[in-house]
């Protein structure tokens, strides 16, 4: 390293000598001789390997977002936040990293995907895996027993994501949760209603919400002959049924997880069933499942849930699916997952799911894990998979070649003649002070045509044009970019006229 630094210094000095000789207009022979020395030194130096090897890119599983992409995101977030607020939720925020012990033991087999951090102070830290566990920690720390909250923030998972399908290592989650002791299934039904409202409002296609109950799963495993120690690992296998065939799931359970083939077959008889409230009624009459206390409680709650979903008018969007397992360890009751459906090729075929876009469930024991006295706070919630939704919306807009505005500018302050920069600056300041979203070009004497073209490219609807005659008459020429219609507006009336044309309230109360 020291030798390289010395050579670099010699190259620098020789380069300065060559430049000096050229400025002094020295003889061509002398300059040529010194240039040869410079080239020889550069050859000795060789290429800078550190610069050659460095590739400018974002880390694996992350990406930058262009103004166009961010405009799409803001619209999606706006739909989600308005829905959360409509249902009476407060907003909170928590640190992006937590103590490692806060996160460990909460995610089952997915714990291996948690990002660990190195901290000079000696604390063992991890990036948050989701927003649910930090929320439970927040409740326990603040001794809260009743809250309805939403939280939109980034989470981190150390897996191998398929970025083309909207899966990343760093991504946003939009969570809504209800904490507190309430009568059964009322908060759960509201969470499902919120999920359906958001997915319908976003207009991303037909969807289906699968529901199940962790107690039904555990009861089913018990009567099929699965040992308690294997409940969670078998659960994670069953959860793959939406992606792979039953045969593949069975092979994993038998070959990799040591389950007896006859036990796997008994599980298969159950987990391949799905339907509505009629399936709940059918299973309540099942001679084996109905004898299991846990399963019976879960089925009873699901029957009640379907009653409330019918009252909310969303029962046609819900399917009771015994294969839904949700791999996270902290779920204790009802679980659900929304999937987008792609239209079947042939009439009469089953709709085909093309990806999960929202999920959630009940987790009554999670807060108690953090409370010193183990006090439980029942919770139920949902999480919207916005990255998947962003990908779908972006693809749709690209296919339609639809133009998206990336700014909210309402008016461009323009000039028709030269030497009117001061007047433009005064006017744009007046508009900003009045709450108008306004811009001007950063040139002293821009051409009017260039100013109008900028408006068309940026989607700015109005142009306020200042000219020498307008200044004498005390008016501003207001031009519609799309219709090209121009009207003279008195300067004192300009703010109200812009607000009227752009649909902005005339006063801020």
From Swiss-Prot:
Gene Ontology MF term list:
ATP binding; histidine-tRNA ligase activity; identical protein binding; protein homodimerization activity; RNA binding
- Spell out the GO cellular component terms annotated for this protein, sorted alphabetically and separated by semicolons: cytoplasm; cytosol; mitochondrion
Just give the chief location class: cytoplasm
Tissue specificity annotation: Brain, heart, liver and kidney.
Q: Give the EC number(s) under which this enzyme is classified.
A: 6.1.1.21
**Protein localization:** Cytoplasm
Q: Which UniProt keywords apply?
A: Acetylation, Aminoacyl-tRNA synthetase, ATP-binding, Charcot-Marie-Tooth disease, Cytoplasm, Deafness, Disease variant, Ligase, Neurodegeneration, Neuropathy, Nucleotide-binding, Phosphoprotein, Protein biosynthesis, Retinitis pigmentosa, Usher syndrome
Any Pfam family: tRNA-synt_His
Purpose? Catalyzes the ATP-dependent ligation of histidine to the 3'-end of its cognate tRNA, via the formation of an aminoacyl-adenylate intermediate (His-AMP). Plays a role in axon guidance.
Per its record, how is this protein called by name? Answer: Histidine--tRNA ligase, cytoplasmic
UniProt organism field: Homo sapiens
Instruction: Identify the gene encoding this protein.
Output: HARS1
